[in-house]
UniProtKB/Swiss-Prot annotation:
The keyword Acetylation does not apply. It catalyses: tRNA(Pro) + L-proline + ATP = L-prolyl-tRNA(Pro) + AMP + diphosphate. Homodimer. It comes from Streptomyces avermitilis (strain ATCC 31267 / DSM 46492 / JCM 5070 / NBRC 14893 / NCIMB 12804 / NRRL 8165 / MA-4680). The gene is proS1. Disulfide bonds: none annotated. It is found in: Cytoplasm. This is Proline--tRNA ligase 1. Its EC number is 6.1.1.15. InterPro entries: aa-tRNA-synt_IIb, aa-tRNA-synth_II, aa-tRNA-synth_II/BPL/LPL, Anticodon-bd, Anticodon-bd_dom_sf, Pro-tRNA-ligase_IIa, Pro-tRNA-synth_IIa_bac-type, Pro-tRNA-Synthase_IIa_type1. It is an enzyme of class 6 (ligase). Its main location: cytoplasm.
Length: 564
């Protein structure tokens, strides 16, 4: 028998107005509908209705993980420092890692992901190729000290995540485990009713090679991705690669210095000279683990520090400050040029191809130089694709202009390879009787993030609108207010429950019909069944929450329809 939840006994307190600090739709509605409450910055409590939705998402994830052969475990969230030191992630995670000490001074962390601990577990449990492949997963809270928690549960410091890990003896096995997860994720997000895109991505601090993100398009999303209208190319903006066009061989004039007073920015320089910003060469200075690096890009483009950081990893990248120019005659703030930077590593975007001519800094105050040609007047140490992707940039696959969109990351899959196995010497005895280094995959789904993404994608002006698979109930029965209507509503609710239907029934006394109807729309159960003006005749009104379609049904018809 399915549960019948009476709102007269349910701890729920809806709000008429949006929270003052709410910036996104999911934040506003999940708080107003009393699904979650803020405990501290980035830390949320899940209330009865919200916990049901969260559990339903976790159930779908668990069912599909089990179906693909995953084995569920539960590892601790409080973890020792040493395994993360062994892989370098104790430092790589930086300030996002929650660190703490016990009373004896031993250092620990709250797990952001569990690659190290799962690797150690498999090292202890598996000794032969016969023990592999194996896929282990858990659904557990994760912790990251976000600098600016925002968007409600979308970017919190504690969040619920499914993380799974595959262990194989060969790269071919890893590819199969990766494909299994990819297919399972598609099934999961389809069952949840999430519109999603699969895009190429970068691995970041996780390490490894192949990596794809599952993104849910939504205006509140913090990820930007591109897709091509002409082919199937799609990628996170940090993973987009630019194919430099061929440069015609042209004999450029000699370098000529220009008097350019008070033009330390590209905007002021372009205006002063009356040239487009694209004719200028912007030279951004950064520090990579304390070493100054110059990055050259066309003046009308911006440097993507995320991309740059990926290229320079594991070095920590930060912008230079005014103090970094002190005592450096070769670096003139606002007038840096690539020529004469022998003491500085020079990285250029592929658009700064050999043979291209630029207007750029002359390394003198109030002075620029024109006809500065890459490959003739300065050398590039490394060509790296480091510009921010823009709408209309050419697709790397077919050349068509790319489209930009915002999205919420709901899943990420990685082929890690042997990074973690190398750190812990994870070997098994192979078929030939010799040690074989294990190869590994890592796969995550943001369970609580999926709730936020669904709220963003499915809500309307009235409130939440959950898909049946994860809604807190199948039907929301509303008693309009009179005793007869309440009696009918409770009777129908019990009969529906007996038929296996999950029911939320609003039997609250002293609450106006208008408030009940508003709450039903806000809470977002997919079907709303009203015991109203025709209750004496045994007739109810059924409303589809998503489409707004209404029809009148007898009690028997309603039970037959909703229990089918």
């Amino acid at each position: 028998m399915a549960q019948v939840q009476r709102m007269s006994r349910l701890m729920v307190k809806t709000l008429r107005d949006d929270p003052a600090d709410a910036e996104t739709l999911n934040h506003k509605l999940l708080v107003r509908a009393d699904y979650v409450r803020r405990t501290a910055a980035g830390i949320w409590s899940w209330l009865p209705l919200g916990k049901k939705v969260l559990e339903n998402v976790a159930r779908v994830v668990r069912e599909e993980m089990d179906a693909m052969g995953g084995q569920e475990v539960l590892l601790p969230a409080l973890l020792p420092k040493e395994p993360y030191e062994a892989t370098g992630r104790w430092e790589e995670y930086g300030p996002e890692l929650f660190r703490l000490k016990d009373r004896k001074g031993a250092e620990y962390l709250l797990g952001p992901t569990h690659e190290e601990i799962f690797t150690q577990l498999v090292k202890d449990q598996c000794s032969s190729y016969k023990d592999l492949p194996v896929i282990l997963y858990q659904i557990q809270a994760k912790y990251r000290d976000e600098a600016r928690p925002r968007a409600g549960i979308l970017r919190g410091r504690e969040f619920l995540m499914k993380d799974s890990y595959s262990f194989d003896t060969a790269d071919e096995g890893l590819a199969q485990s990766y494909a299994l997860h990819r297919e399972a994720y598609i099934k999961i997000f389809n069952r949840l009713g999430l519109d999603h895109r699969i895009v190429s991505a970068v691995s970041g601090a996780m390490g490894g090679s192949a990596s794809e993100e599952f993104l849910a398009p939504a205006p509140a999303g913090e990820d930007t991705f591109v897709d091509c209208p002409a082919c199937d190319y799609a990628a996170n903006t940090e993973a987009v690669t630019f194919v430099a066009p061929a440069v015609e061989s042209v004999e450029h004039p000699a370098v000529e210095e220009l008097d350019t007073p008070d033009t330390p920015t590209i905007e002021s320089l372009a205006e002063y000279l009356g040239v487009p910003a694209s004719a200028t060469l912007k030279n951004l200075l950064v520090k990579a683990d304390g070493e100054i690096v110059a990055v050259g890009v066309p003046g009308d483009r911006e440097v993507d520090l995320g991309k740059l950081g990926e290229h320079l990893a594991p070095a920590v990248v930060e912008l230079v400050t005014a103090e970094d120019f002190e005592g450096r005659d070769d670096l003139v703030r606002g007038y840096v040029g690539p020529q004469g930077l022998e003491k500085v590593r020079y990285i250029a975007d592929p658009r700064v191809a050999p043979g291209t001519a630029w207007i750029t800094g002359a390394n003198k105050i109030n002075t620029h130089a024109k006809n500065v040609v890459a490959g003739r007047d300065f050398e590039v140490d490394d060509y790296l694709d480091v510009v921010v992707v823009e709408e209309g940039d050419p697709c790397p696959s077919c050349g068509t202009g790319l489209r930009l969109d915002r999205a919420i990351e709901i899943g990420h899959i990685f082929q890690l390879g042997r990074k973690y196995a190398d750190a812990f010497q994870l070997d098994v005895l192979g078929k030939e009787g010799k040690p074989v280094r294990v190869t590994m995959g890592s796969y995550g789904i943001g369970v609580s993030r999926a709730v936020a993404a669904l709220a963003e994608q499915t809500a309307d002006e009235q409130g939440l609108c959950w898909p049946k698979e994860i809604a807190p109930a199948d039907v929301h029965v509303v008693a309009a207010g009179k005793a007869l209507q309440t009696e009918l509503a409770l009777d129908v609710a019990e009969k529906l429950g007996a038929a296996g239907v999950r029911v939320l029934v609003d039997d609250r006394a002293g609450v106006s019909p208008g408030v009940k109807f508003t709450d039903a729309e806000l809470i977002g159960v997919p079907q709303i069944l009203v015991a109203g003006r025709r209750s004496a005749e045994g007739v109810l009104e059924l409303k589809d929450r998503k489409t707004g379609e209404r029809e009148e049904l007898t009690v028997e018809e309603a039970i037959a329809r909703l229990s089918a």
